[in-house]
Structure formats: structure tokens, C-alpha cells
Amino acid sequence: VLTDAERKEVTSLWGKASGHAEDYGAEALERLFLSFPTTKTYFSHMDLSKGSAHVRAHGKKVADALTTAVGHFNDMDGALSDLSDLHAHKLRVDPVNFKLLAHCFLVVLARHHPEEFTPSAHAAMDKFLSRVATVLTSKYR
């Protein structure tokens, strides 16, 4: 559970990032695919080249889901329930991939917002993304 101070850190940092949802989401996915090529197997139907419309569109979906999570700190399970079902039952995404993508998002945020990406903001954002990953993998059990 995030503390009030951590929620403020996440809300502040994500407030700056959410206006760039498509760009940041695409960049995080591109980093994921380059750093962890096995993750591409879930996207064999897409053009995964840098800046492709597919990557940008999916990046926006991912970032929009994070925006939803930021808006529902107290009911993340409910807010992300459909997404959790989709990834667990239909897409069958390996749960470790959520952690890998979370790391890529941290890199993107640090790159674009170095002044705001303080040690406390980093820790809060990491905790938040870990919570999102836990929610998304909750239906796997």
C-alpha cells in the first residue's frame, strides 16, 4: 500500500508524464523489446519497428492504464480487473514481463523528467508500478 507521501510523488510525476502517454508508452515498449527480445513473442501480429503505429498505439494503451491506476489508488484491483482478466486468461502473458516493462517505464520517466525523478519519486514510482504488476497478475492464481 502506498503512503500518502508516495501517492503525492506518483501523482505529481505521472501528472507530468500523462500528457505524453503515447510517446512515453511507445518508448517504454521499444526499450522492452530491445532489452528483452523474448517479450516480442506476444506481439507477433504487430509491426514492432521503432515509432511504428502499432507500438505507439499499444504504448498509449499501457500509459492510459497507468493513468487509470493513478486515479484509483484505493481500488486498483477493481479499476484494472478487466485488464487483469485479459492478460491472464486470453493473452497469457508471463507475469515477469510486467516487472520488465515497469523497469523500462522508470527509465523513460527518469530520462524525460530528471529534475522531478528524485530518489523518493523513484522509490514511490517503483512501488506503484510493482503494485500495478501485482494487480495485473492477481488473476493468474
Swiss-Prot record:
Q: Which SUPFAM superfamilies match?
A: Globin-like
Q: Where does O2 bind?
A: H58
**CDD domains annotated for this entry?**
Hb-alpha-like
Give the UniProt keywords, A-Z: Heme, Iron, Metal-binding, Oxygen transport, Transport
Query: What's any one GO cellular component for it?
Result: hemoglobin complex
Regarding tissue, the record states: Red blood cells.
Spell out the subunit comment.
Heterotetramer of two alpha chains and two beta chains.
PANTHER family linked to this entry = HEMOGLOBIN FAMILY MEMBER, HEMOGLOBIN SUBUNIT ALPHA
Protein name listed in UniProt: Hemoglobin subunit alpha-2
Q: Which organism is it from?
A: Tachyglossus aculeatus aculeatus
